[in-house]
Amino acid sequence: MAREFSLKDTRNIGIMAHIDAGKTTTTERILFYTGRVHKIGETHEGASQMDWMEQEQERGITITSAATTAQWKGHRINIIDTPGHVDFTVEVERSLRVLDGAVAVLDAQSGVEPQTETVWRQATTYGVPRIVFINKMDKTGADFMYSVSTLRDRLQANAHPIQLPIGAEDDFVGFVDLIEMQAHISKDDLGQDWEVTEVPADYKDEAESLRESLVEAVAELDEDLMMKYLEGEELTKDELKAAIRKGTCNVEFYPVVCGTAFKNKGVQALLDAVLDYLPSPLDVAAIRGQVPGTDEEVTREPGDDQPFAALAFKVMTDPFVGKLTFFRVYSGTLNSGSYVRNATKDKRERIGRILQMHANSREEISTVYSGDIAAAVGLKDTTTGDTLCDEKNLVILESMEFPEPVIHLSVEPKSKADQDKMGIALAKLAEEDPTFKTFTDEETGETVIGGMGELHLDIIVDRLRREFKVEANVGAPQVSYRETIRTAAQVEGKFVRQSGGRGQFGHVWVEFSPNEEGAGFEFENAIVGGVVPREYIPSVQAGIEEALQNGMIAGYPVIDIKAKLYDGSYHDVDSSEMAFKIAASMALKNAKSKCDPVLLEPISKVEIVVPEEYMGDIMGDVTARRGRVEGMEARGNAQVVKAFVPLAEMFGYATSLRSRTQGRGTYSMVFDHYEEVPKSIAEEIIKKQTGA
């Protein structure tokens, strides 16, 4: 199968936004106008084409970035839908990593919202060019110029309108194209029929003044144009367009367009802007990588004649075809049925079928080309962030880093049948999502799942029930406490058993002392003169390490502790590895009364973004949660509070913050370090754990 669209005519874009800016509806309309969907699916009726997981349809939010392919005016546009909720930032990062450009959707009433800032920052980190679509122009309170000003104030973005809306709220009927200086007026409900006319008289002055500032801003990006502009020459439309494209591709300029996806206005013009201003794979710098096992850096240029290199950016379990691995091809081509090397894991993979995905239907293709996004069926060892490449030209493209889970809860299957299914289901979910972890608690035998926040785990439990038909009881969220010691002490551990036949004899003296924070466990053998024979030393270390896992006061693992074995004795006949192991664990038990053991709790670094008027309330709440405010800063017209707060106090915070700020506050939280639990609280935890 020959290549259908050239690299120059390919666009890989993402649609990014705050949770309710209308991102999914915008994607939906793009699919409608590009002929991929015959009936428009509405998010608030729960039938959107992109939101294909049941929970997404119920909650009306987008969780998984589905990759879809569409065609517009002889170009292929691959669209990745990204979630806008703070618990899913890993999905956003993952999709930004493989995009060449993005459309940032804003709500015309709110402008830049806090989650927009988060996503915008992530896009800046990855150097992703953006155009801005100010959506919901039909909404009460819609204000185009206010929204543009929030881009400049809150994001310090060099953003300029290339359209001016005609009317607003219920009177929004179209826009003035500031480059062509023509008005586009919508003539029907589906937005298929547009009339292009002269700019209405009452919009002329504003349109001319906006065009003037657009020309000036564009001229600043290009020396030749600047000279022409200063000499009073008129810039041609083609020069303007070329300069806007260059500025956008260099991430120095952000063109702004407007519309209402829900009312079908402005989406075709948005698609035109995607073709005009966002980069093709040829406009983006060649991707860098390393030759496995060396420090040698190599680049992969976009082109079908180059060696094959691709990045897997999403793994999903599909009810019909099994495991799907979404990947972006950076160079070369790939045929179904061929073999490639997973350079990250150093494994050979056979590519079974290759599918081009459209939100929830799929088309089988035999070849993918450079710049394409597709999904492969049948990959065994590939997970998110892995590089797939030609077996003779190995390369590892930069990988993605994922944060550790901050919240855990236990899940207990309701029946024996659920037990077996649950293990398989959790393994599949962990494969799809690198920020989700699962393990068995050795003491209680419970299965524990960990993730990035409460919504994250809610959705995992929901998927267990729906997709994998596993019924499970869910425990309350739990914090991972730790223990350590505050004073050094020398303690004895002696295990003697003599009752006919061969006895047991192990005897050690160990000095336990606090280690530096984060240094973990250190063991030192200071035996001289063979008072404890060399072959028993590893058993002493193993005995202490095992005992540390079971805790000293409340059964939580002991961290940051040194153990120095400096004396002891043995018996020629009765001593054994087991006897010394037990003696060592008894030494740790005896240290409890001498070493001043304490309980530690995880402390999260929390950043809360709220409008000024809620500051007092939020600060008071942070203090009430035993938090320590480290600093504050203004960000646009919002305030950012930076604080350290115990994780145990942060459960339910998303809901609490939402109600305190009428949904205008957002927060992000990452684990930072462990700190001692205040005595009164520690006593309660110990009592609960030990039943004493």
From Swiss-Prot:
By what name is this protein known? Elongation factor G
Which parts of the sequence bind GTP? 17-24, 81-85, 135-138
The record's listing under Gene3D superfamilies reads: 3.30.230.10, 3.30.70.240, Elongation Factor G (Translational Gtpase), domain 3, P-loop containing nucleotide triphosphate hydrolases, Translation factors
UniProt xrefs under InterPro entries: EFG_II (IPR041095), EFG_III (IPR009022), EFG_III/V (IPR035647), EFG_IV (IPR047872), EFG_V (IPR035649), EFG_V-like (IPR000640), EFTu-like_2 (IPR004161), G_TR_CS (IPR031157)
Domain tr-type G: start-end pairs: 8-282
Please give the PROSITE patterns that the UniProt record associates with this protein: G_TR_1, G_TR_2
Q: Which family does it belong to?
A: Belongs to the TRAFAC class translation factor GTPase superfamily. Classic translation factor GTPase family. EF-G/EF-2 subfamily.
Q: What Gene Ontology terms for biological process does this UniProt record contain?
A: ribosome disassembly
Cell compartment(s), UniProt? Cytoplasm
Alphabetical UniProt keywords: Cytoplasm, Elongation factor, GTP-binding, Nucleotide-binding, Protein biosynthesis
Which Gene Ontology cellular component terms are annotated?
A: cytoplasm
Origin organism is: Shouchella clausii (strain KSM-K16)
The record's GO molecular-function terms, alphabetically, read: GTP binding; GTPase activity; translation elongation factor activity
Print the organism lineage: Bacteria, Bacillati, Bacillota, Bacilli, Bacillales
Function, in words? Catalyzes the GTP-dependent ribosomal translocation step during translation elongation. During this step, the ribosome changes from the pre-translocational (PRE) to the post-translocational (POST) state as the newly formed A-site-bound peptidyl-tRNA and P-site-bound deacylated tRNA move to the P and E sites, respectively. Catalyzes the coordinated movement of the two tRNA molecules, the mRNA and conformational changes in the ribosome.
Q: Which HAMAP family match?
A: EF_G_EF_2_B
SMART domains for this protein:
EFG_C, EFG_IV
